[in-house]
Amino acid sequence: SRCVIDGLPETHATREFAQRHHGRVFMNFFNEHQRGSLNWDRKAMIVQGNRTEGLDTSRAAIRDRKVVLPRRSALIEMFAKHMAADAKVLDEDADTGTKKYRYIRTGENHFSLAFTYAWLAASNRRRVGTWGR
């Protein structure tokens, strides 16, 4: 199995954790300029991907019922609230007219990012969607 953790803000602590579990733990750093496949660097214990694509993929997993959630409970309600706290918006560059989607945080999103990292780790094994290829 593989674990993906946020590389920020405590890079030193996350790097130590990844080193203790070398080959199984990867620090994630989102790269807004990256498109397509994730970049897994086994030596540096880093995975990079586009944040918007990653959040899109984790939401598709829920929407497409690739993940079975437990029965409705207070914890599942909190999970849903955190998932909804990352809202997708369309930005348009005033100068060029170029349009691009991105996610903005509207509230607590800890479960949203944790689920995205878990799906990212699982996608590397299963090659789920384009983001995991």
Regions found by a protein language model. Name each.
Residues S1-D95:
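Mg2+-dependent endonuclease catalytic cores in nucleic-acid-processing enzymes, primarily RNase H-like
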Residues K66-G132:
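Charge-patterned, long linear interaction tracts outside catalytic cores
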